[in-house]
Amino acid sequence: MHIDTTRFGRVLIQESDLVRLPEGLVGFRSFTQFVLIPDPVMAGLSWLQSATAPELAFGLVAPPLALGDYRVELRPGDRAALELDDERSALIYVILNRAEGGLTVNLQGPLVFNPPRRLGRQMVLTSSRFAVRYPLDGPAILPGPTAFRATA
C-alpha cells in the first residue's frame, strides 16, 4: 500500500508497518493510524507519519542521553491498552520540536510503543520534574529508540 506524505512524497509501506494509536495524540485525537519512518539523513531521528493526513508528521527521538534517570511509569491500564506482556519490549520516544533558540523535546508527553502488537500510546506525565520543552544541546544527543524502564 502507499501513503502520501508532504515530507517524503509517496511512500510504499506494508500493512504490517502501520502503528495504531487508538487514542491519537494530544491535540490530534482523530488521527490513529501512523507509520514510523526513519529519517534518511539524521540517525536517531524518526518520523511518526499519519497514514491518512499527508501533512501530519512528528519528529521522534529517544529521550536524551543526558537524562539517564528519565522514567515513564506504566499503570495497569496503560499496559492493558498497549497489550503489553513484557515491559522490556516497549520503546519510548519523545516528540521533537523546533523552538526559538534551537530544538526541544516534550518530556511530559512521551510515546510508548509495543512493537510486536504495533500499538502506541501517548502518556501524559503529571510530574513537573520534566519539561514540555526540554532543550537539546545538539544532534549528537539524538540516540536510537530507548528500551522501556519502569518505575514502581
Regions found by a protein language model. Name each.
Residues M1-G68, E87-A152:
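Long, compositionally biased stretches
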Residues L82-D85:
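A short glycine-leucine-enriched loop at secondary-structure breakpoints
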